């Protein structure tokens, strides 16, 4: 069980608050390519910011349109300075051809070891649902452990996506991104 950042009755100080923060933006980013491309905004993490147990969470959401020829859609968590983490591919049946859809993706990663031999573990999750349809959403998730990251240099995180093919002109747009550092 983890200890909460503040205990009941504890005095809240500026030095305690600097361990948790968030940043958000509403920049639109679109992906129409069949190659991994950032769909979320990219957030930098300073060298030596991560300690063992430091957790970062990146959420993004938006809309899209399936092409006139149904295509698969893949998401991937990425460490920018490191490498792409586990890839999740959604079958092309997630949405009818030419139909609109809504989507959400969240990456959560925790530092397991620091320095030039640092490692992170984490999870990528999300959902996609066709607009105006009552059928269940398509959920996706992926986990990684022991991914190498040098926490002694600047690094960062983003969520990428790609289409299986550009045939039929599919598109996906991010309408907002939220980055959080959680203690």
Predicted regions and their residues:
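C-terminal trimerization/auto-chaperone modules of long, extracellular attachment fibers and adhesins
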Residues: 2-6, 11
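Surface-exposed molecular-recognition determinants
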Residues: 9-10, 17-183
């Amino acid at each position: 069980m983890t200890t909460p950042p503040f205990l009941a009755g504890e005095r809240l100080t500026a030095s305690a608050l600097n361990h948790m923060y968030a940043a958000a933006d509403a920049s639109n980013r679109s992906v129409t390519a069949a190659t991994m491309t950032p769909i979320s905004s990219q957030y930098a993490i300073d060298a030596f910011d991560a300690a063992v147990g430091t957790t970062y969470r990146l959420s993004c959401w938006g809309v899209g349109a399936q092409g006139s020829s149904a295509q698969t859609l893949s998401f991937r968590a990425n460490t920018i300075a490191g490498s792409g983490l586990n890839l999740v591919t959604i079958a092309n049946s997630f949405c009818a051809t030419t139909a609109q859809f809504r989507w959400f993706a969240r990456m959560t990663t925790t530092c397991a070891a620091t320095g030039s031999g640092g490692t992170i573990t984490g999870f990528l999750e999300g959902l996609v649902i066709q607009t105006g349809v009552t059928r269940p959403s398509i959920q996706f998730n992926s986990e990684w452990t022991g991914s190498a990251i040098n926490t002694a240099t600047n690094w960062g995180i983003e969520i990428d996506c790609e289409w299986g093919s550009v045939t039929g002109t599919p598109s996906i747009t991010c309408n907002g991104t939220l980055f959080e550092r959680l203690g």
